[in-house]
Amino acid sequence: MDKLNAISIFCKVIETQSFTLAAKQQNISVAMASKLVSQLEEHLKTRLLQRTTRKIMPTEAGMMYYQRCQGILLDLDEADSSITQLTSSLQGNLLISVPRDFGLLFIAPNLPTFMAKHPHLHIEVEFNDKKIDLLSEGYDLALRIGYMEDSSLVSRKIGTTTVHFAASPNYLETNGIPQTPDDLEHHNGLLYKNAMNQVNWVGSRINQTQRFKIQSKVVSNSGFALLNMAKAGLGIANLPKFILGRAFEKGELIEILPEYKQQKLEIHVVYPNRRHLPIKVTGISLNF
């Protein structure tokens, strides 16, 4: 039995209340339509339709099965449509929010190529670290870094990053290299302050978790600003690897306490949990 075809013809019979009309819509014979529904009933070991000479009605089990299968068939049609339209040009207006530093590094440089492929799409991009309510504020899509709290959003993981302590060679030469977390209390901290106002540093060594204390010399919501301050020798920064990576490679910054690994941060693309999302949203989400 072709189960998907059997389910499809069964749903059509419910909707048209006719094997003849259902068979015509599916481009099969009436005999084949009847056979598929009978095979489905045999497979489920229950009667789905009450057949009389005048009309066809679903049984209680049949109506329950129809309601569940109808949703599945709609999802399949939507999946087919999204892939088909993904290969063509997207269109419409799109409002998205991305973390400031991540967006400037990875989203902004790739927008020209993406927009050239989809010239009928108009995108408004907000580069900020504010935690937004996608539905109430009218956003179509957002990128988020860190723990996902809002279960009402659909999310898709697109990567991970790690966080590291770092300072310039000049700063460490002048102030000494911290050997233990307790040593951090005697250093200048360049602290990142996100929308949740979390400026505490937490790391783990083996199976031990420890909270690091440090005096805040500068607090900022810009990772790039803190990066430049750290390179200038102002203090010790604690930033994601995607911001620090090039400075590490060039020797402009040195990692501190590398044995204290901080929790990995997951990067997600998120969008509202709406059943029939516009193709422009699903299309662009698959491009991340």
From Swiss-Prot:
One of its GO terms (molecular function) is sequence-specific DNA binding. SUPFAM superfamilies: Periplasmic binding protein-like II, Winged helix' DNA-binding domain. The keyword DNA-binding applies. Keywords: DNA-binding, Transcription, Transcription regulation. PROSITE patterns: HTH_LYSR (PS50931). Pfam families: HTH_1, LysR_substrate. Residues 1-59 form the HTH lysR-type domain. The keyword Repeat does not apply. GO terms for biological process: DNA-templated transcription. It comes from the Bacteria. InterPro entries: LysR_subst-bd (IPR005119), Tscrpt_reg_HTH_LysR (IPR000847), WH-like_DNA-bd_sf (IPR036388), WH_DNA-bd_sf (IPR036390). Residues 19-38 bind DNA. Belongs to the LysR transcriptional regulatory family. PANTHER family: HTH-TYPE TRANSCRIPTIONAL ACTIVATOR TTDR-RELATED, HTH-TYPE TRANSCRIPTIONAL REGULATOR. This is Uncharacterized HTH-type transcriptional regulator HI_1364. It comes from Haemophilus influenzae (strain ATCC 51907 / DSM 11121 / KW20 / Rd). The lineage of its organism: Bacteria, Pseudomonadati, Pseudomonadota, Gammaproteobacteria, Pasteurellales.
